[in-house]
Amino acid sequence: MNKRKPVVALVGPTSVGKTATAIELALTFGGEVVSADSRYLYRGMDIGTDKPTLEERRGVPHHLIDILDPRDDYSLALFQRDAQRAIEEIHARGRLPIVAGGTPLYLRALLEGWRIPPAPPNPELRAQLELRARREGPEALHRELQTVDPVAAARIPPENVRRVIRALEIFLTTGRRMTELEGREAPPWRVLWLGLTMPRDELYRRIDERVDRQVARGLVEEVQRLLEQGVPPDAPAMTALGYRQIVAFLTGQLSLEEAIQRIKYDTHRYARHQLTWLRRMKQVEWYDVTQPGWYEQLRERVERSLREESDEGDVAVHQSGGGKEAPRA
């Protein structure tokens, strides 16, 4: 009988410190990181995504980072395929996959065995919906989605225009809701869900400080460079938080100060949405990163889970001696 192999899923809102924690766990337990952050996929989008540098990765292999041109489209089904392949390859090397990210839809589709609705893209309809989003605003499309598929609307925030459009596209093409077409099958892995959190005021402070750092590091120049390289301002990658607001500044729709404040406000809202989604997942074990000893408790939880697997003859626990101190967020 084949037992399911282990996967650690590290979740939480933006700015809570998932990336640094995933790297520390990987160093401790012989792991590799699989990114479940939709923004990390794109090359040349480093500052606005707060993507870890090679130095910050500390030699830990990372997967699904810098695999796309910003002009490329990407779907949930493609992410699921690519991430599954990465996990299988990591297991084949006898190492521990650590899936880390804040895109709830990606995490759940991958680790809960979702079957993606079999509705082919409709480019003409999609173009019409994209035009409406630009003219009427993403909230208008989200209200329409609430009318035809309230379950999908509850789990897709208005800011995720691509997913809102895809859900509407599925309904308008097939006459059925996305949530009716979705299915699930048991994932082939044993997933340990670990969540990082902190008081909301502290989280907002971290978000605001990060945005200020990004602007100081050259966020405006990064967006300008992408536009000069021919990336359309309405490309899927450019709808990411931080990028669309700076595009609005560069095209004269907002002042720089207004754009910065909009980034902070929209990121606060996105963090709330992430937490709302993740709090519904009863399998997640939460750790408050502002509490003393939180990382040691989390490390011990992973060690205990892997030891239970090892006792059953599935995997070995590889510890390098890392994880003695809490990682920096």
Swiss-Prot record:
Pfam families: IPPT. Residues 306-329 are annotated as: Disordered. One of its GO terms (biological process) is tRNA modification. Keywords: ATP-binding, Magnesium, Nucleotide-binding, Plasmid, Transferase, tRNA processing. Substrate binds at T14, S15, V16, G17, K18, T19. Monomer. Catalyzes the transfer of a dimethylallyl group onto the adenine at position 37 in tRNAs that read codons beginning with uridine, leading to the formation of N6-(dimethylallyl)adenosine (i(6)A). Belongs to the IPP transferase family. This is tRNA dimethylallyltransferase. The gene is miaA.
